[in-house]
């Protein structure tokens, strides 16, 4: 069974086509600059070779059609015809409180996702464009929505509510939702398989660290807390997002600088974090190089970045009354040994010991703690697309029973 996974952004569409009987990736790629000059599709051929196809892509329906044309292309396609695609799974950012799991898309689901656009104004409208496009181009093919927020719906109320007047939760749904849920769900399940331990009784801290970053406390296979909040802005210091900040500092800067709410949002989301402190780049690899050169601002930025992660690991250990596994994933978590060792260097009180040799691993599943470490520290590369495809297939199978 072939399942197509789409991740639609405001000016991009990423795709992966899976053969679900073997979990093999048959095709993958993405369109950039939708609605802008110079739009193109970049695909990876089965032999690893990259190919770029330039074409004017004014909107998402044209983009999805471009992907379909590419998938069926005689030279570099992956299917003979589109009838081979049995379902399409979509990454949808925000499901609010409406969705605690993945769902078959129908008119009611679309209406509910539209209602959540206020909560995910940058992502949900783009996710919907992908859904509308497939409805138009492949109307008979079932579609499934997999929500970034769903995994965190098991958080208790005392963890997800903000201590502001309760009426704002009742009126506007102001609460912590959390994100990267599909990634946290995948890696927390996968690490139990990898270590040969049951999810029941496990206490796992999953650190998804990339340009965006979040941590989740996963107890018995369920999320009990996570660092991101109403939006992906809360929590860790990230590439361009500030993470936790005193609300008073926000209103103070707005008054001093005469900033509108939208301008302040841009400052906190696009101009802060590593970029705001380091001022040269938001890329952790460039920061690492600057630290190696002894640049003081780079060293300060890195210390802040690691400290936030370490602090949350300590907090979530307390929240779960212990920890068995600390897991690193995401672009930085999977590939940057200095980040992992930097985060773990003050976790000795938990009995964490990192093996410097094992920690050299990049992008592969590995235990990087020593044999006598009281807590297992593990790298598990995330695979959100496979998780989306698996959910899609499971829902399709349940329909056919």
Regions found by a protein language model. Give the residues of each.
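Glycine-rich beta-strand-to-loop/alpha-helix junction loops that act as flexible
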Residues: 9, 90-93, 209, 323, ...
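Phosphate/pyrophosphate-binding loops at sites that engage ATP/ADP/AMP, CoA/4′-phosphopantetheine
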Residues: 70-85, 191-198, 313-324
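Adenine-nucleotide phosphate-binding core of ATP-dependent small-molecule kinases
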Residues: 266, 273-277, 284-319
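Glycine-rich phosphate-binding loop of actin/hexokinase-like ATP-binding domains
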Residues: 151-255
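Short beta-strand-loop/turn "lid" adjacent to the catalytic site in phosphate-handling enzymes
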Residues: 71-123, 144, 150-159
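Internal helix-turn-beta structural module
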Residues: 299, 303-324, 333-401
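N-terminal glycine/serine-rich phosphate-binding loop of ATP-dependent small-molecule kinases
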Residues: 1-96
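Catalytic phosphate/nucleotide-handling subdomain of diverse soluble enzymes
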Residues: 219, 225-257, 266, 330-361
């Amino acid at each position: 069974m072939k399942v197509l996974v789409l991740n639609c952004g405001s000016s991009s569409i990423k795709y992966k086509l899976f053969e679900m009987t073997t979990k093999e990736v048959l095709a993958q790629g993405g369109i950039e600059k939708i609605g802008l000059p110079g739009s193109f599709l970049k695909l990876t051929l089965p032999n690893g070779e990259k190919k770029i196809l330039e074409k004017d892509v004014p909107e998402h329906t044209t983009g999805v059609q471009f992907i379909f044309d590419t998938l069926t292309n005689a030279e570099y396609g992956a299917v003979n015809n589109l009838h081979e695609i049995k379902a399409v799974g979509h990454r949808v950012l925000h499901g609010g409180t409406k969705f605690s799991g993945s769902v078959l898309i129908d008119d009611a689901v679309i209406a509910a996702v539209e209602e959540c656009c206020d909560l995910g104004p940058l992502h949900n409208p783009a996710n919907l464009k992908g859904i509308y496009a497939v409805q138009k181009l492949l109307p008979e093919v079932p579609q499934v929505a997999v929500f970034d927020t769903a995994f965190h719906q098991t958080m208790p109320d005392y963890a997800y509510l903000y201590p502001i007047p309760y009426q704002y939760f009742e009126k506007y749904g102001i609460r912590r939702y959390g994100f990267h849920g599909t990634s946290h769900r995948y890696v927390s399940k996968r690490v139990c398989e990898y270590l040969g331990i049951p999810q029941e009784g496990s206490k796992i801290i999953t650190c998804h660290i990339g340009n965006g970053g979040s941590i989740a406390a996963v107890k018995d296979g369920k999320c009990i807390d996570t660092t991101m909040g109403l939006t992906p802005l809360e929590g860790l210091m990230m590439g361009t997002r500030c993470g936790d900040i005193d609300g008073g500092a926000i209103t103070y800067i707005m008054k001093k600088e005469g900033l509108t709410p939208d301008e302040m949002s841009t400052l906190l989301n696009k101009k802060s974090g590593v970029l705001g402190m380091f001022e040269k780049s938001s890329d952790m690899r460039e920061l690492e190089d600057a630290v190696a050169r002894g640049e003081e601002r780079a060293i300060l930025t890195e210390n802040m970045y690691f400290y936030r992660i370490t602090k949350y690991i300590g907090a979530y250990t307390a929240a779960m009354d212990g920890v068995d596994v600390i897991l690193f994933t995401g672009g930085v978590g999977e590939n940057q040994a200095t980040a992992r060792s930097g985060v773990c260097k003050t976790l000795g009180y938990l009995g964490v010991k990192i093996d410097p040799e094992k920690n050299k691993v990049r992008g592969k599943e590995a235990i990087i703690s020593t044999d006598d470490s009281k807590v297992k520290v593990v790298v598990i590369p995330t695979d959100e697309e496979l998780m989306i495809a698996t959910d899609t297939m499971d829902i399709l199978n349940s329909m056919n029973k």
